[in-house]
């Protein structure tokens, strides 16, 4: 988008917010991810909102708030020759206490970026000699697709797929 298009979009959104907001009413909106919080602050959006609309910083996205213990477990699995880590790309740079998946990958760890959890099934079939460890991370809204994947793995009779789970509750 050009700067003019961005300005037009912002103006349109602000007009809609002002039209929907009832004077004297308090509306609280939660920005869930720390990246959103930074963007809102940097762009000065808080100051543009009418009084009565409050922005509340939330818990942080599951990736941003992943603890080092979880990452250290993932790294320990990644360092095993008999293991492939299946993960979403945004997990690659999350630091553990001594490394990250991205760094481990440069040292020869088998890290496979996936776009949907169900990809672990094909990965498992392609590499039956390897243990496939899926880093199942997300909010409670993503649990259903993880459960569907667990069920599909079970129904396919795959014995080499494992789930390292860390879901967050909003």
Residue ranges and their predicted role:
Residues 1-129, 143, 153-155, 164:
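Metallocofactor- and cofactor-centric catalytic cores in central/energy metabolism, strongly enriched
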Residues 135, 139-170:
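Phosphate/pyrophosphate-binding betaalpha-module
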